[in-house]
Amino acid sequence: MKVVIAIDSLKGSLSSIEAGMAIKEGVLRAKPDARIVVKPLADGGEGTTDALIEGMNGERIDLTVTGPMHAPVNAYYGYLKDSNTAVMEMASAAGITLVPDDTKDPLLATSYGVGEMINHALQKGCRNFIIGIGGSATNDGGIGMLKALGVRFLDENDVDAGEGGQALAKVSRIDISGLNPLLREAHIQVACDVNNPLCGENGSTYVYGPQKGVTENQKKQLDEAMAHFAQITSKTLGTDYCNTPGAGAAGGLGFAFLSYLGATLTPGIELILSAVGLEQELSDADVVVTGEGRLDFQTAMGKAPVGVAKLAKKHYAKVIAFAGSVTKEAAACNKEAIDAFFPILRNICTLAEAMDSATAKANMTATAEQVFRLL
């Protein structure tokens, strides 16, 4: 029997690999001769960098970059030496969690630190990039990131237009001659799970701006500024990605990646499953095990476990899911390629007790053992 395990992290309790290894131990208790492969799993959002560092023998690279409100922040990315790949989350450098609610200012917030992370990875030798862009604090169209990478944004007086959302309307000329030449050799894949265009009522400012501090009175102003920036970009580069699905992601960062860096935007789970080479292991798998901290209706809507399950079904494998907790709505997962799912809790306890790492590991192992005794 070949068993492939790819389970998302149980946030605050077990990492993806820790959960996978706990399941492996349980399977081996029931099936000592089983061939078992454990792969890291994430959806391109929070925790993706950590999952791939741990699951693909990566190295954590710590660095100090310019934060969203221009003060230095500690950020990090993953370095996968074998493939010269950098795995990073823009939120590490310009995330909304780095900005207290009372200091949010979309007119000033910058993505400059994201560009600094990319520069650092390029200098280290990385030529492949996997970048998650969820959880941003910015609405600057990616101007900050691009400035860090060498692009100049000039106003009508041919001086620097500044940074943040306030700079967008001032841009009169764009000079890309200083763009880091190493980017010509780079292949950038962006994990993007939103389809919003750059501008308009479904664009970045109107949909995501309010959570970043955009007031009702600022929406029209910032959206028009974003459209102006897109127009100057199109005039300069001869491309138009303004209405491309995902262009509005991360305050227009999606647009910047498409227009200036030749990146591809891919649903997060698809990108991660490809990066970890999961499908290659599924061709001869008998059973696939997946799961996450909580199985519910959102899981069935296409979160990481369902992505694994659907891929497994292409190869006719049975799919089992384990979770810390399971809601009534999780029954929808059975219609989304998960054959059976099981909560791992074994007795009534507090949330803190359930999330204790040692307890969760023991529960995961015990549940896996009992389930696999039936197979």
Residue ranges of predicted features:
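N-terminal loops that bind phosphate or other acidic moieties
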Residues: K2-I133, A137-L375
